[in-house]
Curated annotation (Swiss-Prot):
Keyword Isomerase: yes
Enzyme class of the recorded protein, top EC level: isomerase
Active-site residues from the entry: E162, E256
Activity over temperature: Optimum temperature is 55 degrees Celsius.
Residues that bind substrate: Y16, E168, D195, T196, F197, H198, R227
Catalytic activity: D-allulose = keto-D-fructose
Job of this protein: Involved in the biosynthesis of D-psicose. Catalyzes the reversible epimerization of D-fructose at the C3 position to yield D-psicose. The enzyme is highly specific for D-psicose and shows very low activity with D-tagatose.
Regulation acting on activity, per entry: Completely inhibited by EDTA and partially inhibited by Zn(2+), Mg(2+) and Cu(2+).
Cofactor note: Binds 1 Mn(2+) or Co(2+) ion per subunit.
Binding site for Mn(2+): E162, D195, H221, E256
Organism: Enterocloster bolteae (strain ATCC BAA-613 / DSM 15670 / CCUG 46953 / JCM 12243 / WAL 16351) (Clostridium bolteae)
Gene Ontology molecular function: cobalt ion binding; manganese ion binding; racemase and epimerase activity, acting on carbohydrates and derivatives
UniProt name for this protein: D-psicose 3-epimerase
Keyword Endoplasmic reticulum found: no
Length: 301
């Protein structure tokens, strides 16, 4: 398993393409140009586009080669739909999820993507109008991820189990729960994914949670308590950086800010107002670059 080539080993900084958009589909080459010019190491993409937009082997190879040309590593994120749910009581929903992921993982391998993060063990957005069976759903997720991890190992793609806040998920809300979960699955290619936005709601001490995760931490999302870019809110970034240094974190640290209301993204992320006064592309670029410089300075990595 590898995230980066040996000559560029170490934690790398990235950003999710959806910071600039209101929909989950985009021209990824455009955002490769942008994030490379801004100084990032990583662009995170949505896997939904690999089913609906980038559908051919030639297109996937083209994206891979363009990323290399720009000096970028690609990472991937996904929120499964309710119809393709690894923890479902419905065998058809589980079958559809397995089919989707077993088709997706070789595509990620072809693209030289080695981390897939998100609430992969369940579905998103979660329906809280029904009585969710946490223990039963957790057991089914463990069983099905054990099977799926074999394909992940063959494709050398780490599955990052994202720890979500109580308003977006119910199976994994804390790092402690995620540790037990990934240990029970028992695969080198199933790891924990932490997100500072969610951690701010659920963790008593964010830095301690990172240290507890240790080498189980496979992926990291960065964002303020209100989804702004790092450095524009109140999170304890110096403590977070120290914890990452303490565990010698070698993965990607990907910013996942959402600042625009409207569109599918604004609706699903629950952004009900514009979060910054200037939403011009130039201003968003400026904030992203400033956040990158802030993280590199404060984290010291």
């Amino acid at each position: 398993m590898r995230y980066f080539k040996e000559e560029v080993a170490g934690m790398k900084y990235g950003i999710y393409f959806a910071y600039w958009t209101k929909e989950w589909f985009a021209d990824y080459k455009k955002y490769m140009d942008k994030v490379s010019a801004l100084g990032f190491d990583v662009l995170e993409i949505s896997c939904a586009a690999l089913r609906d937009v980038y559908t051919t082997k030639e297109q996937l190879i083209e994206l891979r080669e363009y990323a290399k040309e720009k000096g970028l590593v690609l990472t991937a994120g996904y929120g499964p739909t309710k119809a393709e749910n690894l923890c479902s009581e419905d065998p058809e929903a589980v079958r559809r999820a397995m089919t989707f992921f077993k088709d997706l993982l070789p595509k990620l391998q072809l693209m030289d993507i080695h981390i897939l993060g998100g609430g992969l063990y369940s579905y998103w957005p979660v329906d809280f109008t029904i009585n969710n069976d946490k223990q039963g759903d957790r057991a089914r997720a463990v069983r099905n991820l054990r099977e799926l991890s074999k394909t992940a190992e063959e494709c050398d793609v780490v599955l990052g189990m994202e720890v979500l806040n109580r308003y977006e998920g119910y199976i994994l809300n804390t790092c402690e729960e995620a540790i037990d979960f990934v240990d029970e699955i028992g695969s080198s290619h199933v790891k924990i994914m932490l997100d500072t936005f969610h951690m701010n709601i659920e963790e008593t001490n964010m830095a301690d949670a990172i240290r507890k995760a240790g080498d189980r931490l496979g992926h990291l999302h960065l964002g303020e308590q209100n989804r702004l870019v790092p450095g524009k809110g109140s999170l304890p970034w110096a403590e977070i950086g120290q914890a990452l240094r303490d565990i010698n974190y070698q993965g990607a640290a990907v910013m996942e800010p959402f600042v625009m209301q409207g569109g599918t993204i604004g609706s699903e992320i629950k952004v009900w107002r514009d979060m910054v006064p200037d939403l011009s592309e130039e201003a968003l670029d400026r904030d992203a670059k400033g956040a990158l410089e802030f993280c590199r300075h404060v984290f010291g990595i």
